Amino acid sequence: MSKTVIAGNWKMHMTCAQARDFISAYLPLIKNVPKGRELVLAPPFTAISTLSEILKGSNVSLSSQNVHWEDNGAFTAEISPKMLLEHSVSYAIVGHSEPRKYFSESDKQINLRAKSAQANGLIPIVCVGETIEQRERGEAERVIRRQVEQGLEETDKKKLIVAYEPIWAIGTGKTCEANEANRICGLIRQWANCPEILIQYGGSVKPGNIDEIMAMSDIDGVLVGGASLDPESFARISNYKVE
C-alpha cells in the first residue's frame, strides 16, 4: 500500500455518463503524479462497473462506499466484498459519518465491515470523527478514541486506512485547522498503537488548502468529498505540492 492515498468520495453523485466525462477530463491532468502517491475514486455502486473498465491500466484505483460483512444473503441494499472484487475494487469506505447518522451504524457493525473487507483482500478506509456538539463539550478525543479502538479491533492495522473527518467540517466549507487536524491524527496513531498506520484527513478539503494539509507530519492523505466531483479541482488536489 502506498504511503500517501488521495481518495475522492462521490457519495450519491454521478451517473455513468457523467463518470465517463469526469475520467476523460481527469486522467490527462494526473499523468505526472509522483510515484508512491495512490489515487482512489469511490463512485456510486452503479458506476463501479463502468469505471472498472475505463480505469484499466491507469494510475487510479477504485473504492466502494461501503461493504457488508457477509459474502451473500438477505441483506437488501447491501453489497458484498466478492461482488466488489469482480470489478477490480481495491478499497472500501466504512464508518462514514453519513451512514453512522442516517442509518445508526454502530462501531461494532463498522468493525465487522472492516474485518470482512480485509479478509477478502480489500483495504478498508475506516472513518472516524466528532460532531460540533461533542467538540464544544470537550468530548472529541474520547469519541474518536472509542471509534478507533472499537472500529479497528482484531484488524491488521498495517493494511487499512483511518480517515479523520470532523463531522462539522464535512460539506460545510469549514475546515479543521491544519495543526489541529494533525494533532488529532497523531493521537489516532497512538490510540491505534501502530506507528505505520496510514491516516487521512477529510472535511472540506479543496485546492486552496491541500498543500497545507499535506505538509502536516501525521497526515498521510485525504478523503475528499465535494471537491472530487470536479476533474480540475480533484486533479489539483491529486497533484498537491510539497515544499
Swiss-Prot record:
Q: Which reaction does it catalyse?
A: D-glyceraldehyde 3-phosphate = dihydroxyacetone phosphate
Query: Which GO cellular component terms, listed alphabetically, does the Swiss-Prot or TrEMBL entry include?
Result: cytosol
Higher taxonomy: Bacteria, Bacillati, Cyanobacteriota, Cyanophyceae, Synechococcales
Similarity comment text for this entry: Belongs to the triosephosphate isomerase family.
What is the protein name stated in its UniProt record?
Answer: Triosephosphate isomerase
Q: What is its EC number?
A: 5.3.1.1
Task: Reply yes or no: does the keyword Cytoplasm apply.
Answer: yes
Task: Write down the CDD domains for this protein, in alphabetical order.
Answer: TIM
Show the stretches that span the lipid bilayer: none
Q: Where in the cell is it found?
A: Cytoplasm
